[in-house]
Amino acid sequence: MNALRLLSPAKLNLFLHITGRRADGYHLLQTLFQLLDYGDELYFEIRDHGPITLAPALPSVDFEQNLIIRAARALEPYKPKPLGVDIQLTKRLPMGGGIGGGSSNAATTLVALNHLWQCGLSKQQLQTLGLQLGADVPVFVNAQTAWAEGVGESLQPIEIPPKWFLVVQPDCHVSTAEIFSHGDLTRDTAAIKVAAFLERGGQNDCEVLVRKLYPQVDEALNWLQQFDRHARMTGTGACVFASFDSVEKAQWVQTQLPAHLPGFVAKGVNQSPLYKLLPAS
């Protein structure tokens, strides 16, 4: 095999609790990463020799700083032959939306090139490389909906009943660094067990602050909560979502969206397509 076409899926944080802060400044979290059947698409075609190429280039991102390129570079020391690769990106997910676009692209690249270049790295090794690229990359390498703790690196795969989600994209870019460094952020939520979340749910500890700082997010949530009172923000935003028991209901609500609020409907899945490509050990 010398080529692969893969979905690079989005994720949602079904809840996000900040339970503390380590001495090094990193926040301790609890969250449930829900993978979706919607995302970007990446096509990889191996070259017998030559460089790593990516098309199209993202105009706002330096080539070498693109997470796709950084992931490919991280694997280069492990490839047994001097192979290159041409990568084509079909971008559907917004940048800075809190739904994991860049992190998912990096994870998809790690898993795909480990397979195509025959690098022979284990899933754990790929996750370790991924963590160097971003805190959310390991969950996409893991390729399973998962309960996460610590700084997001402790992952417990979890199977939950399928839901349909309407994800809405407010017209703003939320700075994760700004939110996590803000003095008003809640950092002392009590830790909960999986069973407690499944019974009673949770909240997003970043949401109150983001709604105050970004009126576009507040507006989008106010609109969505007409249809789902549990609608909430994912990650540090800006995207927000509502869940439904049927695709028909999700699509109907999508048709009611105001013209200035784009959105998409996706199904929650317990595994992404990457799962079948992961090494056995």
Curated annotation (Swiss-Prot):
Gene3D superfamilies: 3.30.230.10, GHMP kinase, C-terminal domain
Any single Pfam family the record assigns to this protein: GHMP_kinases_C
InterPro entries named in the record: GHMP_kinase_C_dom, GHMP_kinase_C_sf, GHMP_kinase_N_dom, IspE, Ribosomal_Su5_D2-typ_SF, Ribsml_uS5_D2-typ_fold_subgr
Top class in the EC scheme: transferase
GO MF assignments: 4-(cytidine 5'-diphospho)-2-C-methyl-D-erythritol kinase activity; ATP binding
Protein residues bound to ATP: 94-104
Active site residues according to the UniProt entry: 11, 136
Biological process terms in GO annotation: isopentenyl diphosphate biosynthetic process, methylerythritol 4-phosphate pathway; terpenoid biosynthetic process
Keywords noted in UniProt: ATP-binding, Isoprene biosynthesis, Kinase, Nucleotide-binding, Transferase
EC number: 2.7.1.148
Coiled coil: none
Pathway entry: Isoprenoid biosynthesis; isopentenyl diphosphate biosynthesis via DXP pathway; isopentenyl diphosphate from 1-deoxy-D-xylulose 5-phosphate: step 3/6
Catalytic activity: 4-CDP-2-C-methyl-D-erythritol + ATP = 4-CDP-2-C-methyl-D-erythritol 2-phosphate + ADP + H(+)
Entry-linked SUPFAM superfamilies: GHMP Kinase, C-terminal domain, Ribosomal protein S5 domain 2-like
Family that this chain belongs to: Belongs to the GHMP kinase family. IspE subfamily.
HAMAP family xrefs: IspE
Function: Catalyzes the phosphorylation of the position 2 hydroxy group of 4-diphosphocytidyl-2C-methyl-D-erythritol.
PANTHER family per record: 4-DIPHOSPHOCYTIDYL-2-C-METHYL-D-ERYTHRITOL KINASE, CHLOROPLASTIC
Protein name in UniProt: 4-diphosphocytidyl-2-C-methyl-D-erythritol kinase
Organism: Cellvibrio japonicus (strain Ueda107)
Gene that specifies this protein: ispE
